[in-house]
Curated annotation (Swiss-Prot):
Name of the protein this chain belongs to: UDP-N-acetylmuramate--L-alanine ligase
SUPFAM superfamilies: MurCD N-terminal domain, MurD-like peptide ligases, catalytic domain, MurD-like peptide ligases, peptide-binding domain
Gene Ontology molecular-function annotations: ATP binding; UDP-N-acetylmuramate-L-alanine ligase activity
One Gene Ontology term from the biological process aspect of the record: regulation of cell shape
Family classification: Belongs to the MurCDEF family.
Annotated EC: 6.3.2.8
Reactions catalysed: UDP-N-acetyl-alpha-D-muramate + L-alanine + ATP = UDP-N-acetyl-alpha-D-muramoyl-L-alanine + ADP + phosphate + H(+)
Membrane-spanning residues: none
Keyword annotations: ATP-binding, Cell cycle, Cell division, Cell shape, Cell wall biogenesis/degradation, Cytoplasm, Ligase, Nucleotide-binding, Peptidoglycan synthesis
Organism of derivation: Roseiflexus castenholzii (strain DSM 13941 / HLO8)
Top-level EC class: ligase
Pathway note: Cell wall biogenesis; peptidoglycan biosynthesis
Originating gene: murC
Binding positions for ATP per the UniProt entry: 107-113
């Protein structure tokens, strides 16, 4: 069967394409730009065209469109005119989950890392899982795979457009719940209501795994049989404390050693009302948020019967997904890291991880805010998001599918940030020049956002490298 995918360059739709290719289907697609995701698909035989035209639909049997594409899109209109079924991600998720054990990872933050960790744990256990991940994952080689149909299918269950409600998972994780996607969910109550519906779709509450550290996640679940996980330093000193009984999976004695994180894992036994040391783990990710992601993955893998050896091997091996604390390079003592963080909570967590790993560095942060709706709806949440940074620079808003005034929205956001050194730096080119000029040896430049703001870091590295080369030439 021939599938044509509109918006194939995105993480979610490229994952759909990989699964369809694994199943033996013909895949074509269209998007506005080429990237590493489309290059990988083209190497596998997908025919991708850049731009959008009715003729691109070709002889497709089915058309699949990203949620960001409206029904009036010219390729969707052409497909309907010709009687070609038009599907969304949710339709395929629903089809693929029939007759298969599904592990769904939902939540506002941490979905990509948690999903990838579970998939890697299953792989290291000798299972060939299927997976759909919303980010490039070098350790797995690809962001989606159909795998063995008899093995679990691990899905990053995106809540955008309520897509995750297409799933009735056997095991589900809710990493955290904080109001997001304000264009779909006009209020926090509507956002939480969608997660409540998702939680109810898990047949057995004992197979629902929830972050006990997050108030939003606890609110939307509320079932006493759900497994909870979290970080509890007191457990190392008093493992018999009744207060710890709320957590089924607990990380204690968390310590950071450069690029490595170590923690002890304690397990609460509900039958005996006691705790036991389950193991000691090391991973190549930093930050408390990544410890929580690891706990969620451990709980899911253990529920699936995966042994500690495979779990530990995957944790020690996993290098992270692209654009998740992604070290881009170092020039003249200046390190550049990029992260997808674009929500205030994600920014705080990423900054905390950066401070833990680079405690002596001056941290220069560039944020490219993402979408006008999110920027204006969350203005009051940004006040202390940058407290751990030394210098804060705010770029023009990346509009994505929206329209508005990028500079005005950036100024509105910057005006809410309680930081002694915050400025608006304009578009990507202007931001690059401004930030490159203030960087000095020993600095860490952290570029944040879900748009193309990563280019600031890449171009800064290039400019710094050229300046360094010129300096060396003049000295000789």
């Amino acid at each position: 069967m021939h599938y044509h995918i509109v918006g194939i360059a995105g993480a979610g739709m490229s994952a759909i394409a990989h699964i369809l290719l694994d199943q033996g289907h013909t895949v074509s697609g269209s998007d506005l730009q080429q990237n590493t995701l489309t290059a990988a698909l083209e190497q596998r035989g997908a025919r991708i065209r850049y731009g959008h035209e009715p003729a691109f639909v070709g002889d497709a049997d089915r058309l699949v469109a990203t949620s960001a594409v409206q029904d009036e899109h010219i390729e969707l209109v052409e497909a309907r005119k010709r009687g070609i079924p038009v599907l969304r991600r949710a339709d395929l998720w629903r089809e693929w989950s029939h007759g298969r054990q599904v592990v769904a990872v939902a939540g506002t933050h941490g979905k990509t890392t948690t999903t990838a960790l579970i998939a890697l744990m299953l792989t290291r256990a000798g299972i060939a899982p299927g997976f759909l991940i919303g980010g490039e994952t070098p350790d797995l080689g690809v962001n989606a795979r159909w795998g063995n149909p008899a093995a679990p299918l691990v899905v990053e269950a995106d809540e955008y457009d309520r897509t995750f409600l297409a799933l009735t998972p056997d095991i589900a994780i809710i990493t955290n719940v904080e109001w997001e996607h304000v264009d779909i969910y006009p209020s926090p109550d509507e956002y939480e209501a969608a997660f409540r519906t998702f939680a109810r779709q898990v047949a057995h509450p004992q197979r629902l795994i929830v972050c006990g550290d997050n108030a939003g996640a606890r609110r939307v679940v509320g079932h006493p049989d759900a497994q909870q996980y979290g970080i509890e330093e007191a457990i190392a000193r008093n493992p018999a404390s009744c207060r710890l009984a709320l957590m089924d999976w607990m990380a204690a004695n968390v310590r950071y050693d450069g690029s490595m994180t170590h923690f002890d894992l304690w397990r609460y036994d509900r039958r005996t009302c006691g705790t036991r040391l389950e193991g000691m783990y090391t991973m190549r990710l930093v930050g408390d948020h990544n410890v929580q992601n690891a706990l969620a993955a451990i709980a899911a893998a253990t529920t699936l019967g995966i042994d500690r050896t495979a779990i530990g091997a995957a944790l020690a091996e996993y290098r992270g997904a692209r654009r998740r604390f992604d070290i881009k390079g170092e020039v003249n003592g200046i390190t550049v890291i990029d992260d997808y963080a674009h929500h205030p909570t994600e920014v705080r967590a990423t900054l905390a991880a950066a401070r833990a790993r680079f405690p002596q560095h001056r941290i220069v942060v560039y944020l490219q805010p993402h979408t006008f709706s999110r920027t204006y709806a969350m203005l009051d949440n940004w006040t202390h998001a940058f407290d751990a940074a030394d210098i804060v620079r705010i770029g023009d808003v990346y509009p994505a599918r929206e329209t508005g005034e990028p500079r005005a929205a950036a100024r509105a956001l910057a005006g809410r940030i309680a930081h002694p050194d915050v400025e608006v730096v304009g578009d990507v080119a202007t931001a690059t020049a401004t930030i490159t000029a203030l960087l000095q040896p020993g600095d860490l430049l952290l570029t944040l956002g879900a748009g193309d703001g990563y280019r600031v870091g890449e171009m800064a590295l290039l400019a710094l490298g050229q300046a360094d080369d010129q300096s060396e030439s003049s000295e000789t």
